[in-house]
A protein has these predicted regions:
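Helix-rich terminal scaffold detector
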Residues: 1-63, 158
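Structured, basic alpha/beta domains of bacterial-type, RNA-associated proteins
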Residues: 59-79
């Protein structure tokens, strides 16, 4: 099994979700199934079918998270010594060359990505273009609207 890179924060977020699924969601869906069974004929019981579907989703998500955590390589960005290069976990200050717009992103695992929070997936086109770059380098990113150029203004490990 391949390792899955996660920041400490991302691993903690997955652990919290796993605990919630096991201690709250699983019990709630079992209760919903029990209540639906009490209504009688299961062959035409929409509540029962919905609860069983939800149970399948919850159990699948539990297995998914457990698998990811078992394969996780947890990386603490503050301990990185990447000599100013962009690596997994680093926070990158960028300036879009055409518009001059400035953005800051942290490169994180797929399950941690949240663009509104400035967290981009290691698998994203922009992260792949940035890996290995240093301050002053320009990254070319194939975006849906065409190729965009970003200058790396700074790289931090926080």
């Amino acid at each position: 099994m391949a390792t899955i890179p996660l920041t400490r924060r991302g691993a903690e977020k997955l652990r919290d979700e796993l605990a919630r699924l096991k201690s709250v969601e699983r019990h709630a869906v079992i209760q919903a199934i029990s209540e639906a069974r009490a209504q009688g004929d299961l062959s035409e019981n929409a509540e029962y079918e919905a609860a069983k579907d939800k149970q399948g989703f919850i159990e699948g998500r539990i297995l998914d998270i457990e698998s990811k955590l078992a394969a996780a390589q947890i990386i603490d960005p503050s301990t990185l010594d990447a000599e100013g290069r962009v690596v997994f976990g680093s926070t990158v200050d960028l300036q879009e060359e055409e518009s001059g717009a400035k953005v800051t992103y942290q490169i994180v695992g797929d399950d941690e990505a949240d663009l509104k929070q400035g967290l981009i997936s290691i698998s994203s086109p922009i992260a792949r273009a940035l890996i290995g770059k240093s301050a002053g380098d320009v990254a070319e990113v194939n975006a849906p609207g065409g190729v965009k150029s970003y200058e790396v203004v700074g790289v931090r490990y926080v």
